[in-house]
Amino acid sequence: MKFRKGRPKIPRLISEEPQFKLFKPAGTPGIELESEVLTFEELESLRLVDYLNQPHEEAADAMGISRRVFWNILKSARKKVADALINGKMIDIGGGYYKIRECNYEDECQRGRNCRYGVSNCLTLKKDSE
């Protein structure tokens, strides 16, 4: 019989996967740079609070998580971005444990298959391989 510590992890809701998933300092080859991995839910927390100016409570509700969990995700995201900017690291966006919040093609969706509109399996749970 397997026992789990704590509560089960709830997938975070994000609006969409970003179009651009890699940022690096100009003029330096990427192979020479250290990288900082920013998860999709960390990027979503930055988008909601710092870009859209939503209060933490609204942003946490939008992501389907508690304010405390939201704060921890946001704090981690800000630390990673600051480290990358100050120390000249590459920012690699990807991974995490999330679901896409909305899909504009729900009526035409084929559950369990790749979305023909490029939404990347919007109804399928995404999880890190870690």
UniProtKB/Swiss-Prot annotation:
Family to which this protein belongs: Belongs to the UPF0251 family.
UniProt superkingdom: Archaea
Protein name, UniProt field: UPF0251 protein MmarC6_0272
